[in-house]
């Protein structure tokens, strides 16, 4: 219940602008300005109660409490490590980033790339902090997390051994911005150890809010040069590297002076006329050092003598700044992988940059309702969340070789908080997605889930290349104009997890979650429906010997269980007392807490209708129905509910084996009827909004 309320509150705050980089969410409710002011007024240095300087902040296994790796660690403030600590010395550069005893080189590479773009850097590392002015032992940083920017506050106590920083540190002995940034990121993810092992892409995205693509340069797509060209034009961050097959190869230099295992930045592409033929060039930068490529098109290479002198003057950069040109064909031969981080619109201010359009959805896979697994599980696949994208504007600059106009879309499916959950044994799920073209006859279908029949025998237009246990799977797709259904899923069904689905499009795209409405039109029987069997019905129960009497919840339980126990076509252990109280709440017209005969007749007709639906769904006659079948059963009963409500129902009414018995099924139906009835009575303006005082809310909630 608390989680649901928090989720609603979060959605409403986001609608008001909370979560932007200018108005970041306060992580764990900690406000930097308020806390710093309190410390300055009291004359004490900040000690973070949410991420204390203790073993649990270091880790849970290799760096866990009592482990050999943590012996001798002392937490110290920079003011205890040197006489003149500085936040940043002479600007933030790649030399400020030196790896310590933690396997987070992926994070270091991302930070190094961030230093090349000052505007993006200072979104993450606010400049309003130092060890001199207003120093109070407190610092703050901002990270993008699943659709919102989060401000993380830390104290400046850092883990040391023998007087030296244990983890990330600067080449300048008195500079601490990078070590403090690493600590803030560790806090966000639960511990320092949680940062071990990862992809540079993950850091790129958390520092920019962008969406990333990965290309294996051993199997490059034919349009890769064009993709790089467009990415640079959109202000994207591009990185490439040469894979290493073993630890001995790390830092090794090739014959032509390329460093293996290092992240290079891609900074430009150009096509030149070389000896009468077009030659594609690419410009790279090694942010880690001055070692440069010595092959074709390097600074002193003879190829420059065969192009137009004016063009040569524009492109031939002779300064030893780590930046160099090479042919695109050599690039594909020498490098192993390319990563592109496409920036979200709010990251870019220049009007010259062609910005992406962004649509973002947050969702959840819940066992028994929306965790349907991949296409290999047709019985449950259709229950996964479904999202509709409407593409009606084609790209302005169509790619060479494309015969028909198309729309370029970047799809990214990201699972949430799995790094933070490592300490409780929850690793990454294998995730993926499929995209289906929606036929014309279903283009206006938005109010309810597409069912199993839609997917039967239908092939997706495109899908993620494979299901992978990465934080995010993403791909660039080109689709003809039309409407498409995106289905994100885990590989196996019944896996709980939160996710974020992002759609980046070159032109504005309309997108929505299928079945987001919650209409309800339950079956309303009338006592006249039983007139023909009146005497037979009353003879079944001694409780109604006097037809003017009323029955309580305990009497109702005895009557109903007695009636249903006579049936031989169902397995049923009886209604519990709480379900019977819910029944009375629905039909008790005079507020006495009991049912009159006419009300009981209406209830019995409802139960008969529910039983008919239940038995239709109980295919095995086992006395339970699968929780994922509740969506279909609810629809038959008149309720078309969105994913959030379906997930709540599965959590509330399904047992640990994901079955729903008849008592739970009826309790769910009755509860839904009560809630819909209450809302409609209170929604006088019929605008879908009800306002209640606390006392009114409590009275209605306790009904």
Swiss-Prot record:
Renumbered residue ranges of the record's region Linker: 513-531
EC number: 3.4.22.53
Tissues and organs where the protein is expressed, per its UniProt entry: Predominantly expressed in the stomach. Localizes strictly to the surface mucus cells in the gastric epithelium and the mucus-secreting goblet cells in the duodenum.
Enzymatic reactions: Broad endopeptidase specificity
Compartment(s) of residence: Cytoplasm; Golgi apparatus
Class of this enzyme: hydrolase
Keywords recorded for this protein, A-Z: Autocatalytic cleavage, Calcium, Cytoplasm, Golgi apparatus, Hydrolase, Metal-binding, Protease, Repeat, Thiol protease
A Pfam family hit: Calpain_III
Entry comment on modification after translation: Undergoes autolytic cleavage between Ala-5 and Ala-6 which gives rise to fragments extending from Ala-6 to the C-terminus, Ala-6 to the EF-hand 2 domain and from Ala-6 to the beginning of domain III.
Protein origin, superkingdom: Eukaryota
Region described as Domain III: spans on this chain: 355-512
Recorded GO CC terms: Golgi apparatus
Regulation: The concentration of calcium for half-maximal activity is 0.3 mM. Inhibited by calpastatin and calpeptin.
Residues binding Ca(2+) 1, per UniProt: 588, 590, 592, 594, 599
Active site: 105, 262, 286
Alphabetized SMART domains for the sequence: calpain_III, CysPc
Function statement: Calcium-regulated non-lysosomal thiol-protease. Involved in membrane trafficking in the gastric surface mucus cells (pit cells) and may involve the membrane trafficking of mucus cells via interactions with coat protein. Proteolytically cleaves the beta-subunit of coatomer complex.
Name this polypeptide is given: Calpain-8
